[in-house]
Structure formats: structure tokens, C-alpha cells
A protein has these predicted regions:
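Major-groove DNA-contacting interfaces characterized by cationic-aromatic clusters
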Residues: 30-35, 120-170
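Short, basic (Lys/Arg/His-rich) helix/loop patches that form interaction surfaces
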Residues: 143-146, 166-211
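Short, polar N-cap/turn motifs at the start of nucleic acid-interacting alpha helices
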Residues: 86-90, 185, 204-222
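Short, charged phosphate-coordinating catalytic segments
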Residues: 68-91, 207-208
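DNA breakage-rejoining catalytic core of tyrosine-based enzymes
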Residues: 21-50, 105-125, 142
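N-terminal DNA-binding recognition helix of tyrosine site-specific recombinases/integrases
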Residues: 1-32, 74-76, 170
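Conserved tyrosine-mediated DNA breakage-rejoining catalytic core shared by Y-recombinases
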Residues: 81-131
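Basic, Lys/Arg- and aromatic-enriched nucleic-acid-binding interface segment
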Residues: 46-75
Length: 222
């Protein structure tokens, strides 16, 4: 079965964040045009991401890949997220993502004019519910600093970069066994590009997108 056919016959895979009917055919045409320009990032469309998530039945694996898709986080940023970074009960649910540099300096003061963290709104209610269920069913883990004795919260996902890549590879292979094939090679960074393109399709201003992506320079977003 082709991927468009798979999505068409799976209503649950339709993206809940789309405010208007998603023109999948037009989006595919635009992406096909972009493929001729090798400097442009490779990305999946929202229904394709949903199809891939379908092949991640493990709860924690699904939640992590869904986090990459819903936040645009780099993999190292997502793997550093702690439970306290998720604010799921606020009027506007959001996650606070710390930069790698800020994590290395243990939360020290950032340079003047620069923000150490970025706040990403979580606009998909299904994803927010998924994270609530995950936190309700698992215990938060802590570690003690050997030098100071300070008790610190550990990341939600205690796995390596390679492990996450293996999860994705297995999901892609499972999809292929069902005849569902993706037009690009899928990696953790694919979801960051997909997040950005999804917001652009939703007419989010590039300056806002720049902030959500954590890019210091607009050229990085462009």
C-alpha cells in the first residue's frame, strides 16, 4: 500500500494540529520541487510522521519520537529533558528546552542578550495527554552528586543517541514490511526539520520559528 493510501484509510493518523484540512497532495508537490535543491533540509509531512509513529508501539519510544516532532528539539536536547521541564497543566502547555551549552555550565547566567532556554508551546492535545499518562505511570528518577550530595532529577529518557536511531530504524523497517515506504531516509533530526516545515505550512512567522528552533541567526532558520 502506498503511504498516501495508508493515511487515507487511517483517520486516526490525521494531524490534530491542522486548523484546516491538510492538502496532502499539494504539500507533496511542493516537497518534490524542493528535492531538486540539495541544500534544502529533508523532512516528513505531518501525515507521514503520524504513520511512522504508528510503528512505535512501545510507550516510551513513541513518547520520545513524538517529543522530537512536537518540539523541534535536537536529539541531545530531548534526551536531557527532565520531568520538571514539561509544564502540562498550564493554560498553554509548554516545554522548556535548555541549550547544550547551558546544561554544561549547570544553569549559569547566559551572556547578555542571549537566552539559555527556549519555551516551546505544545499545541497538540493528544501529545500533552500522552506525556501526562507517561508521567503518571512512571516514577521520576534521581541521582546524587558524588561531590556535593545534591539530589538531582534525571532525564525522562535514559537512553543513548544510538538507541534512539535503532528505534527509528526498526519502525521504518516495520512500516516497509507493511508496504509503507517513506520518500527520505529518516533520522532523529528529520523530526526537527519536519516540525519547522509544519509550522511554516501553518503560516507561523519566520521570526517566531527562529525562536522556537533556538537559532541565534535567522540564516540558520532560512
Amino acid at each position: 500500500m502506498s503511504l498516501p493510501g495508508f493515511i487515507h484509510h487511517s483517520p486516526a493518523l490525521q494531524d490534530s494540529r491542522q486548523p484546516a484540512p491538510f492538502d496532502y497532495g499539494r504539500a507533496l508537490s511542493l516537497r518534490e520541487m524542493a528535492r531538486h535543491y540539495t541544500e534544502l533540509p529533508k523532512y516528513l509531512l505531518a501525515p507521514e510522521v503520524s504513520a511512522l509513529l504508528h510503528y512505535l508501539p512501545d510507550w516510551e519510544q513513541h513518547a520520545l519520537i513524538n517529543t522530537l516532532w512536537n518540539t523541534g528539539a535536537r536529539l541531545n536536547e530531548a534526551l536531557a529533558l527532565r520531568r520538571r521541564d514539561f509544564h502540562l497543566s498550564e493554560a498553554i502547555p509548554h516545554v522548556v528546552i535548555r541549550t547544550a551549552k547551558q546544561r554544561r555550565t549547570a544553569g549559569g547566567r547566559p551572556k547578555k542578550g542571549k537566552s539559555a532556554n527556549r519555551v516551546v508551546p505544545l499545541s497538540d492535545p493528544a501529545y500533552v495527554d500522552e506525556m501526562r499518562r507517561l508521567f503518571a505511570s512512571t516514577r521520576e528518577r534521581f541521582e546524587e552528586d558524588a561531590d556535593t550530595g545534591e539530589r538531582r532529577a534525571m532525564p525522562v529518557w535514559g537512553v543513548t543517541d544510538r538507541t534512539v536511531r535503532n528505534w527509528i530504524e526498526r519502525a521504518v523497517s516495520a512500516a516497509e514490511r507493511d508496504g509503507v515506504r517513506f520518500s527520505i531516509a529518516v533520522s532523529p533530526h528529520t523530526f526537527r526539520h519536519s516540525f519547522a516545515m509544519h509550522l511554516l505550512y501553518g503560516h507561523v512567522h519566520p521570526k517566531v520559528l527562529q525562536g522556537l528552533m533556538g537559532h541565534e541567526k535567522s540564516e540558520s532558520t532560512e
